[in-house]
Amino acid sequence: MARSFKRPDEAAMQRVFARTSGGAAEVVLRLAWLQGLHRAEITALRWDQVDFAGRALLLPDRTIPLDPSAEACLRAWYVRCAGNPECVAVSDRDQTPMRPESVSRLARQALNSEGLALSLLDLRRDFILRQIEAHGWSYAAQVSGVAAAALREEFLPRLRAANTLPEAPKVGRDEREYLLWRIIQQEGSSPAGLALWM
């Protein structure tokens, strides 16, 4: 049986973004829904991991292309948070780093204001589903940091039930491609990493 996921209504999310425009809640929600970050990744995100020139988030285990609206939001937030040049998730009031519980509470309040009974995890799952539907299993594995096999186990029944399966999953190829990508990410510019790139 397919596990049911709570998926946000896009129009409702746009209303939430408009209501929270320019604040910490908008940043948190965009990082979860448009970039697929976990709560722990949101609270740990530093400005040196936000590559505006390369339009990407550079996390320790993966690189995530920046959604244009998330990029615009982060650029405005960067200017506003000049008082805290390190941490991205800071409070509106005093620009101090937010605790994980505060991030969840802020997101829940913003989502509830539009009648959306969702969590940050629901937003991340929706991000992953959208990546699978739009780009396939391998790409979704790369940007989510979840192995393709684990993605298939969790999301394949849901996609089949919704009749939105993008392609038949290629178990061997996708998994090998993802594992090679992870090794290259971990090795970086080491001799082994450079050899793999060649």
Where are these regions (language model features)?
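Catalytic-site neighborhood detector that most strongly recognizes the C-terminal catalytic loop/helix
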Residues: 137, 144-177, 181-185
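Short, basic (Lys/Arg/His-rich) helix/loop patches that form interaction surfaces
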Residues: 104-142, 161, 168-169
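Intrinsically disordered, low-complexity regulatory regions
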Residues: 183-198
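Active-site/catalytic core of tyrosine-dependent DNA strand-transfer enzymes
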Residues: 67-116
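Alpha-helix N-cap/helix-start motif at helix boundaries, enriched for small hydrophobics
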Residues: 28-29, 40-45, 140
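DNA breakage-rejoining catalytic core of tyrosine-based enzymes
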Residues: 1-14, 60-69, 82-86
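Basic, Lys/Arg- and aromatic-enriched nucleic-acid-binding interface segment
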Residues: 5-39, 124
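Conserved tyrosine-mediated DNA breakage-rejoining catalytic core shared by Y-recombinases
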Residues: 35, 44-74
